[in-house]
């Protein structure tokens, strides 16, 4: 999906990854991340958000819940980390990093609510009154007021399978009335997902019905004299989409893919955020005229199509196609069109969610100074593997 953008925006990353691989420093099935470019992308996002009065929570799941990189990004001025599930929150807190937003996309389990409240989580999203009551009890016990967001939806909204949740919009007044009865809670705002999506036919990011529902819910409360401070609209957050979010009165967004430049809008390599990561593998064997590289990092929604194959003997890079991958099977190996020498390096660049892969994550700095250096190795869940 992003091979052409990678070649256009960050050819130095390709060279650095192949050089480190030739030195035996990077193994197959590794996401190689250009740390300096991620930080540059992060700065651009912060600067753009400030122009439009939007606060940004940092999302880490796309780059493998990586605490080292998260800490560097937080220093740029992000309002905190958003943990999309309780295991991501655990990784961040164990690394000494505070979690600003938790509960969306995945609710906090009952026996972890008290810890999330006591740890000082800025805001917690709730999908049910039952969960709101758990948060209320924990807040009272901790002697603090916990800010909460309500996730809302309407019947015609788009929800990904496995993410069906929230309060239906027409019940919002009744829900808010119940929330206001709960001690220790402050209703800070509303959220939904996905609020923006890339439209391939239009060639741009467009608002979803979900964003309209979110805005309508805010206006619905305002007419009843209930003002909210936070309108959180995640999905497809980027330098290009932030102005659109501002037009809708959005106050908070949560960039993830934009940090690595792997947003659908950047397929041609023409966005302010530059590609900052690639997936490196190696030819394992041949079968019936095609080559198979080591798998582990395939993501079925990644739109991976093209690969670069590097043969050390002649220092040649050849572009080929990734053949059809059976999404119902484990990606032990991935098929590439044509025969290439065994143990040649393979580079792909596609949309991923590293935390659901088996990949290693290799952090590299100094690429654009011509001095690439590995500064950290992690697994796909943010656990250090040493330098």
Predicted regions and their residues:
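A charged N-terminal "starter" segment
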Residues: 1-107, 112, 381-387
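Aromatic/hydrophobic pocket-lining residues that form π-stacking "cages" and hydrophobic walls in ligand
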Residues: 45, 135, 214-217
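Active-site loop ensemble at the mouth of alpha/beta enzyme cores that anchors a bound cofactor
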Residues: 237-317
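C-terminal accessory subdomain/extension
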Residues: 290-387
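Active-site-proximal beta-alpha core segment in soluble small-molecule metabolic enzymes
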Residues: 57-192, 196-198
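Active-site loop/helix belt of alpha/beta enzymes
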Residues: 154-268
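Structural beta-strand/beta-sheet cores of well-ordered domains, especially the beta-sheet scaffolds
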Residues: 122, 146, 183, 229, ...
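Glycine-rich tight-turn/loop motif centered on a GG-T
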Residues: 23-34, 118-124, 159-166, 201-208
């Amino acid at each position: 999906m992003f091979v052409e953008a990678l070649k256009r925006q960050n050819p130095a990353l390709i060279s650095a990854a192949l050089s480190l691989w030739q030195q035996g420093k990077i193994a197959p099935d590794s996401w190689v991340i250009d740390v300096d470019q991620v930080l540059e992308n992060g700065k651009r996002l912060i600067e753009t958000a400030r122009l439009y009065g939007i606060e940004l929570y940092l999302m880490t799941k796309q780059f493998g819940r990586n605490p080292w990189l998260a800490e560097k990004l937080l220093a740029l001025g992000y309002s905190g980390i958003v943990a999309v599930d309780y295991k991501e929150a655990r990784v961040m807190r164990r690394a000494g990093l505070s979690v600003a937003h938790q509960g969306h996309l995945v609710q906090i389990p009952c026996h972890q609510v008290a810890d999330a409240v006591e740890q000082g989580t800025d805001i917690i999203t709730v999908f049910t009154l039952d969960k709101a009551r758990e948060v209320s009890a924990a807040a009272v016990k901790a002697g603090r007021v916990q800010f909460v967001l309500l996730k809302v939806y309407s019947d015609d909204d788009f929800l990904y399978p496995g993410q069906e949740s929230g309060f239906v919009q027409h019940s919002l007044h009744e829900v808010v009335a119940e929330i206001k009865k709960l001690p220790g809670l402050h209703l800070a705002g509303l959220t939904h997902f996905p609020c923006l999506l890339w439209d391939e036919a239009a060639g741009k990011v467009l608002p979803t019905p979900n964003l309209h529902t979110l805005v309508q819910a805010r206006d619905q409360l305002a007419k009843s004299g209930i003002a909210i401070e936070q309108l959180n609209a995640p999905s497809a957050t980027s330098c290009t989409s932030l102005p659109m979010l501002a037009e809708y009165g959005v106050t908070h967004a949560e960039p993830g893919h934009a940090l690595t430049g792997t947003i659908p809008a950047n397929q041609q390599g023409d966005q302010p955020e530059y590609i900052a990561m690639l997936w490196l593998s190696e030819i394992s064997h041949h079968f019936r005229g095609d080559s198979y590289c080591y798998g582990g990092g395939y993501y079925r929604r990644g739109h991976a199509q093209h690969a670069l194959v590097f043969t050390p003997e002649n220092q040649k890079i050849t572009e080929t196609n990734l053949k059809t991958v059976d999404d119902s099977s484990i990606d032990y190996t991935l098929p590439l069109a044509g025969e290439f020498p065994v143990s040649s390096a393979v580079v792909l660049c596609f949309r991923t969610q590293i935390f659901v892969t088996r990949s290693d994550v290799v952090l590299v700095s100094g690429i654009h100074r011509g001095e690439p250096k590995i500064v950290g190795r992690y697994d796909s869940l943010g656990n250090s593997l040493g330098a």
